[in-house]
Every structure is written in C-alpha cells, then in structure tokens.
C-alpha cells in the first residue's frame, strides 16, 4: 500500500493519521505539507492564491497540524521520499504527490498531453501515479500512463460525500487500474473539525462534496463542478515496456 502525501492537513486527526499509516507499514510519499512541517515552515505551500477561501482553509488545517503533531512525527516526515518507485508487470512506475519536479503542482484531467508527456519524461518511468489535484482519473499518453488516484481525505468536487482511492492489479502483460469510491463517516469528521475550531470551509466541503469556488482548477475541468463521478477502470497494456531491474521501496529522499 502506498499513500501519496498530504496526510496532515485534512480534517482534525493529523497525528492519528500518521500513526495509523506507520503502524501498518504503509509507504508514504512526501507532499508539500510533509516537506514543510518537517522543517517548521509556517505555510503549507499548497499553491492556492493568497487570501483565497482555499488558502484560508488550507492554512487553518496546516496550523492545526503544526500544533498537534509530535516532534518525532515531524522528523519522520523529513525522512520521506519525494518519489517512490516500484515495478509491476515489467512496467516501472513512480508515485509522486503532485508533479514530478513540483510537489504542489495540480495536474487535472484536462491537462494537455504535452504537459503530461513532459512530466513522464522527467520521471524516467513508464507511468506516474499522483494525487494533488484530488480528482481521480487515468490518462494514456502514447504508451505511457498518468494516473491520479484521487484523495482519500476530501471529496472530488462532485457533490457526493465520498472519498477516492485506486487499486492496481498486475497480470502478465497489463495492469488493471481501478478507481474506487469510499463511503466514510463524514458526520464524525465534520464534528471533529468544528470542535477543533478549524475553518468551516473544510466542514462545508465534507458536507456538500464541493470545493470552494476559488480553488485553482483548469477552465475545462471547472466547467462541470458537482457532476457525480463514477467508479472506473483501465486495462493498461505493458507489452511494449522494456524490462527493468526490480525496484525497492524508497525510504529517504
């Protein structure tokens, strides 16, 4: 199991989330939040416009995490890799939080092929799995894969009270990539947010399934906010992939 970063700034259970991931030996990739908490930076660096509703929301969550996460956990965050790699069905895959070289880059479903091709080339892999844009989707560019796993901690702006994750299953000549929805106790999460005094925009997003309107998102992707997403799957052929040495888990940058 791999978690693609951002564990500290959603809802009110930052320390408990970190403890859960570590207890179960989940591979965690550093997002912009982990990078900054580990060195004591005062802003999350999520990439939102200064003073926007999303910036205020993110700052509220980040400040709460900064005050509740243990020092030892911050040190652990500083040891996390920026990219984790593994080999499956001969394909060499990378897991990043946002972009390959820019941790807080949001890559949305309507991102041009040229941009994805550049990111994939920089990765040096056959495919990349990321998360920062929080919308689950799969794109094939030439024979390569760009996949956004969705967020396990925030609805996907589709007006449903669900979270998203991805299951990848290997076969001899392909990888089956399934985007799955997760129902969760949103009422309990909202109650904790309110009790902790976090920005109400965070609670509103969980209750409505919609993000603040000023969230940075491409015009094409923003055209249909609130349209319910459906679970989907892609069978990605790895027949043309050149075999590579088996990758090990990365435990440090």
Q: For the regions a protein language model found, what residue spans apply to each?
A:
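Core catalytic region of metal-dependent phosphoesterases/phosphodiesterases
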Residues: 1-65
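Active-site environment of divalent metal-dependent phosphoester hydrolases
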Residues: 9-12, 33-39, 127-140, 154-157
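Active-site-proximal segments of metal-dependent phosphoesterases and phosphodiesterases across multiple
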Residues: 48-56, 89-123
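Metallo-beta-lactamase
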Residues: 57-92
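Conserved hydrophobic/aromatic beta-strand scaffold that supports enzyme active sites
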Residues: 83-85, 95, 138, 165-167
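Acidic, His/Gly-rich catalytic cores of divalent-metal-dependent hydrolytic chemistry
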Residues: 140-253
């Amino acid at each position: 199991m791999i978690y693609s970063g951002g564990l500290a700034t959603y809802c009110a259970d930052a320390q408990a989330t970190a403890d859960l991931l570590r207890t179960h030996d989940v591979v965690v990739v550093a997002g912009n939040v982990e990078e900054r908490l580990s060195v004591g930076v005062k802003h999350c660096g999520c990439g939102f416009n200064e003073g926007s509703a999303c910036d205020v929301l993110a700052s509220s969550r980040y400040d709460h995490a900064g005050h509740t996460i243990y020092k030892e956990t911050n040190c652990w965050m500083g040891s996390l890799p920026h990219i984790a790699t593994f080999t499956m069905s001969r394909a060499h895959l990378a897991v990043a939080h946002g972009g390959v070289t820019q941790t807080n880059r949001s890559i949305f479903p309507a991102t041009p092929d040229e941009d994805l091709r550049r990111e994939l080339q920089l990765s040096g892999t056959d495919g990349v799995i990321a998360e920062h844009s929080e919308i689950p989707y799969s794109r094939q560019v030439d024979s390569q894969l760009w996949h956004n796993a969705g967020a396990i901690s925030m609805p996907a702006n589709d007006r449903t009270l669900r979270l998203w994750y991805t299951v990848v299953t290997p076969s001899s000549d392909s990888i089956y990539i399934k985007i799955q929805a997760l129902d969760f106790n949103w009422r309990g999460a909202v109650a904790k947010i309110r009790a902790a005094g976090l920005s109400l925009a965070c609670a509103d997003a969980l209750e409505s399934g919609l993000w603040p309107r000023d969230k940075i998102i491409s015009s094409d992707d923003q055209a249909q906010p609130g349209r319910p997403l459906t679970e989907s799957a892609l069978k990605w052929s790895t027949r043309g992939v050149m075999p590579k040495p088996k990758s090990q888990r990365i435990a440090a940058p």
